[in-house]
């Protein structure tokens, strides 16, 4: 019960963290040191801040796309390896079944031969 409660609290905290990251505020206007700065400076600063923020996000998107490509490539490689291992396992299973059948036939032949020899020896003693 306590474990489930802790897990739900952790999940809630993770969701809350992701939500806050989604809606973090971009500082449009830097804090003005002088009260008399004009409207043009404020707009230019806002535009510069937005461009910087956009550049950071574009770089982050580019990095995440690279990571995604790498993970997709690794996943594809892993799937190929799993497929080849599965095929190899199937082939080995078939070979095992054939060898098991051959072994069973050899044992049966050997038992028949041993039975014939025993019958022959018994008939000589009678």
UniProtKB/Swiss-Prot annotation:
Residues 76-113 form a coiled coil. Disruption phenotype: Impairs the formation of preautophagosomal structures. Keywords: Autophagy, Coiled coil, Membrane, Protein transport, Transport. It is a peripheral membrane protein. CDD domains: Atg16_CCD. Its main location: membrane. One of its GO terms (biological process) is autophagy. Belongs to the ATG16 family. Stabilizes the ATG5-ATG12 conjugate. The ATG5-ATG12/ATG16 complex is required for efficient promotion of ATG8-conjugation to phosphatidylethanolamine and ATG8 localization to the pre-autophagosomal structure (PAS). Also recruits ATG3 to the PAS. Involved in endoplasmic reticulum-specific autophagic process and is essential for the survival of cells subjected to severe ER stress. Kluyveromyces marxianus proteins are shorter in length and have a more ordered secondary structure than their S.cerevisiae counterparts, which might contribute to the superior thermotolerance and solubility. K.marxianus could be therefore useful as a new model organism for further elucidation of the molecular details of autophagy. This is Autophagy-related protein 16. It comes from Kluyveromyces marxianus (strain DMKU3-1042 / BCC 29191 / NBRC 104275). The gene is ATG16.
